[in-house]
Amino acid sequence: MKNILAEAEVSEKFESEFAIYDLPEFLRAVELFEKPALKFNGGSNVTIADANSKQSIKYFFADKSVIVAPTKAINMPDQYVAFTLKKNDFTRIQKAITTLNLPDVAVVGDGKNIKLVATDKKNKSSNDYSEVIGESDKKFTAYFKAENLKIISDDYDVEISKQKISHFINRNKPVQYWIALEPDSEF
């Protein structure tokens, strides 16, 4: 998959290098524990547990050969539009995606407002959810696959480029994502 890149700075030291195929799944697994502790078991898996519980997860690593890593740093093209995506707005769009079973998310500028829209762009009679999240004098529609927006729920400064790439910069943690837009995005 070459449409998402995440970068984070962490203070923890890791015993060994490992690959995770589905990072959102791994993060959700870690979040199941109040005070998670990771124990690396050789080179094939990690045990996630909490000192105050009897539960644990044995989580297997991916083969490093299936992970696509960038060979050079990403240079974000000039932004066409920028806005702040608040955690509450992000949480609501995620709930709408799940509740209405919608595969697409659009960031839409109508010349006045910026809306976040959960939709099925291939089905004109599908249910839609929309919410005004900002203002812009620009007209555009930037499409994402909903599955590509599995990022840490938080506040983000978002930049979108006409070259069909976006940059999500977490406002509270040293985490950022570059997520490709869908080819039918319009500027």
Question: Where in this protein do the model-derived segments appear?
Answer:
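DNA polymerase processivity clamps
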Residues: 1-59, 79-187
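Long, charge-dense
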Residues: 64-83
